[in-house]
Amino acid sequence: MASSTHDWRRVSPAQSGDPAAAKLIARATEHLGQTPHPLPRLHTEGTLPHQGIYDESVVAARDFPVMRDAALAWRLTRDKRFAEQVDTFLHAWVGTYVPSFNPIDETKFDALIQAYTLARDGLTPGTREETQRFLRTLAEGYIGRTDAARQPLSHTWINNWQSHRIKLMAMSAAALGDRALIEQTHRLFLQQLANNVRPDGSVEDFEDRDALHYVVYDLEPLTMAAIAVQPFGQHWLRERASNGATLAAAIDWLTPYADGSRTHEEYVHSHVAFDKKRADAGLPGFSGLWEPKSAGTLYWQAARLDPNYRPLAERLAATAPDWLALCAAR
């Protein structure tokens, strides 16, 4: 672990009187009796409810926010029951799950990584070590697969999939405090900006899907990656890629839609047949006008990188998600 004591997920008992903290502690307390439901594989990408292991995967992935809540509650209260629950859940998951390196299936592991980062000092040595090995496998596996992909990169190596890979790389590297992994991730972050974000700020996913839903789904993980590496002297929000693109420009491109100045009918000209299947199945958000409030988390994350985004974040969602309000870098 790096010598830095200012983890990228910070929270202290002094914040336990915060209304968001009280709400989170109450929720975590309700879940203290819950047991983990680890699976060796999760798979929801490209499938609909009740197909394959979709339903089981959704149920199992609910463990991740439970362990993050417990980790936050431990940091707020130092009640060892919460640390013990995180330890139990982490041990179960990292001892069972085999990474598939499908970033859409694995994107929700971000909450597991946050749980480890928050509760690391309260874990048993065995769980701490096996989780570190798991996170290293995750980071190195995603980096290695990107580097081995056929050049020039295309398809899922330049769309939202790669943004989710970058997030998992960055969060794992930061949780480990491994500066060499952070530098490798930084290189791939800039590569993704060059491949995914146009100089005007529009993204590959909007061109392909004709949906602002996918702009948000593409930018949220890149923003999370930037938050993760901030304590290591990395400032990725306005760093320019080789084509001049920046993460900030992509967020700013979305802003006229997020603030209501412009509207967009979703998926009308999507090139992906699965989008129509989801609309036909009645899944919410896959037809009709885009809902700006769905970008609330993105703008709250962006506000952690630049407070100028906060007024719009507050319009979209009155408060940040509690985990972000309590522990993201301030």
Feature roles, as predicted:
Residues P103, T156-N160, H213:
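Alpha-helix capping and helix-loop boundary segments enriched in small/acidic/polar residues
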